[in-house]
Amino acid sequence: LVKVGIVNGTEAKPHSRPYMVSIQLNEIHICGGFLISEEFVLTAAHCWNGLEILTVVVGAHDLTDSKNSDRIGVKSYIPHPSYMINFSWNDIMLLRLQEKVNLNNYAKWISLPKKGEDVEVNTLCSVAGWGQLITNGPKSSRLMEANVHIMNNKECHKRWEDKFSVSQMMCTHGLGGSCI
């Protein structure tokens, strides 16, 4: 399993990101995702090995406190058809939930950009999650966030070479962020 975290981040204001969900295996957080509708979550395909039964926790800020949150089972797993384990290409997956999310102040879906809509270089963006706070360190039970800036694709390709795909990825830089 790929280990991801929010490095050099700060704790998010509770419930300020109501679209964020915790994807869990045996009630242990393994990945983050976000609601894109009342019954679909978007996440990374590497979060599921093809056999596990995952659940999604919506409405959470602190994973040790179930107040205002709901646990929902996953009805179906829809990884990108070209995703291959151990490769970063096409690492995206939809989860169809067993029941619709009860939308409220703690659980709302996020708006997705329209097709062809680009994010300008140097745009300030945020990343969020419950991952590790430092490399190989402990995971946070509280939602963390960090600000990053969008990087120029040419600069990113120069730095990452064949590991970067302009059509599938975006590069960011900053003092904190999501690290693999």
Protein language model features and the residues they cover:
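Acidic glycine-/aspartate-rich tracts in secreted/extracellular proteins
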Residues: H46-G50, A60-T64, Q98-L103, G131-I134, ...
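Active-site substrate-binding loop(s) of clan PA
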Residues: I78-M84, K100-L143
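Conserved catalytic-core segment of clan PA serine endopeptidases
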Residues: V7, V57-N102, K115, E161-D162
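Terminal peptide-recognition signature
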Residues: V21, G33, E39, T43, ...
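Extracellular trypsin-like serine protease catalytic domains
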Residues: K3-V7, M20-N26, T123-I180
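Extracellular/luminal ectodomains of metazoan preproproteins built from arrays
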Residues: L1-H15, V101-N105, I110, D118-T123, ...
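Short edge-strand/loop segments of extracellular domains
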Residues: T55-D65, S111-E117, N147-N153
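Protease-domain processing segments flanking chymotrypsin-fold serine proteases, especially trypsin-like
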Residues: L1-L42, L54-A60, D65
